[in-house]
Amino acid sequence: VTTPTKPRSAYHRGRDLEHRVRTHLREEGYEVLRTAGSKSKVDLVAIKPGQILFVQCKRSGALPPAEWNALWDLAQMVGAVPVLAEQLTRGRRYWRLTARKDRPGARQPYVELTLDELAAGVAV
């Protein structure tokens, strides 16, 4: 007899994405701390010598202006790189926030980020 499975909640799917991103960043040599708790400004803090990434993980790749600006402001305050990790069908994509977000639906001010750029010391 097979027991029907419950659909996974949005919380569990989001947490799973955070764990996958954390694992990937660790494989890239970062020390990664997960900030457990819903609605925090930062999901993951990734640290390498001379680098701090503040990472917000979103399956949709979209952040409302209030969350966007909270992440941006906090990163600016301490000199961290604000990063949005987006879930793709296979793998993930990283975006570096480049400015505050003015309004909902506006094109998000970001550029694609590869971790190799950071390792090579490319200006971020």
Regions found by a protein language model. Give the residues of each.
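Acidic-basic catalytic patches of nuclease active cores, encompassing PD-(D/E)XK
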Residues: V1-T35
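Domain-level recognition of nuclease-like catalytic cores that cleave nucleotide substrates
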Residues: H12, W72, Q76-V124
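Conserved catalytic cores of phosphodiester-cleaving nucleases, focusing on short active-site segments
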Residues: L25, L44-G61
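Alpha-helix C-cap/termination motif
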Residues: E28, I47, M77-V78
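Structural signal for conserved beta-strand scaffold positions within catalytic alpha/beta enzyme cores
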Residues: R34, Q56, L84-E86
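Short acidic/glycine-enriched loop/turn segments that link adjacent beta-strands
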Residues: S38-K41, G91
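Short, surface-exposed beta-edge/turn micro-motifs
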Residues: K41-V42, Q51-I52, A80-V83
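Active-site-adjacent loop/helix micro-motif of nuclease/hydrolase catalytic cores
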Residues: S60-L71
